[in-house]
Amino acid sequence: MNTNKALFLDRDGIINIDKGYVSQKEDFEFQKGIFELLKHAKSLGYKLLLITNQSGINRGYYTLKDFEQLTQYLQESLFKELGFNLDGIYFCRHAPEENCACRKPKPSLILQAAKEHQICLEQSFMIGDKESDMLAGLNAKVKNNLLLIQNPLKTPHSWIQCKDFKEMIDLIK
């Protein structure tokens, strides 16, 4: 039975500032407000699951080992700052033209994470900064989809647009 709730989190643009194909810890900078968001969600019992497209691997911009080392740095930094880690890391290494089954906006990474962590999608949130993040959430049937964006988009979709993490914290109960 799926009884856990989760925050499905994009990495670049949500966890860290998106500087384009971030692969080294020297280039990794946490987003302002992300620690507060993660702490709030964790205190309410949410699992924290990273869902990220990392096409830089297959494009040859960086290696799988680079990604794994940066992910280890991310986890160690979170533990040092907050006393906990992300509960799961799910990534797609493919470029869009490879037409794989795992790249957002396809839902398979979210569905895999939900299955492995017994997540109730009705009680969960997808948090991202791009349309592909929101569409992945919608395609996976995640009930709540929060888009971090400074300039609101006109969209027929049911996601909620937030200008900062404070707005998101107020929505996550």
Curated annotation (Swiss-Prot):
This is D-glycero-beta-D-manno-heptose-1,7-bisphosphate 7-phosphatase. Substrate binds at D10, R11, D12, D18, K19, G20, Y21, T52, N53, Q54, S55, R103, K104, K130. The active site is at D10 (nucleophile), D12 (proton donor). The gene is gmhB. It catalyses: D-glycero-beta-D-manno-heptose 1,7-bisphosphate + H2O = D-glycero-beta-D-manno-heptose 1-phosphate + phosphate. Pathway: Nucleotide-sugar biosynthesis; ADP-L-glycero-beta-D-manno-heptose biosynthesis; ADP-L-glycero-beta-D-manno-heptose from D-glycero-beta-D-manno-heptose 7-phosphate: step 2/4; Bacterial outer membrane biogenesis; LPS core biosynthesis. Belongs to the GmhB family. Its cofactor is Mg(2+); Zn(2+). CDD domains: HAD_HisB-N (cd07503). It comes from the Bacteria. The keyword Lipid metabolism does not apply. Its EC number is 3.1.3.82. It is an enzyme of class 3 (hydrolase). The record marks T52, K104 as: Stabilizes the phosphoryl group. The record marks R103 as: Contributes to substrate recognition. Monomer. GO terms for biological process: ADP-L-glycero-beta-D-manno-heptose biosynthetic process; lipopolysaccharide core region biosynthetic process. Zn(2+) binds at C92, H94, C100, C102. GO terms for cellular component: cytoplasm. Keywords: Carbohydrate metabolism, Cytoplasm, Hydrolase, Lipopolysaccharide biosynthesis, Magnesium, Metal-binding, Zinc.
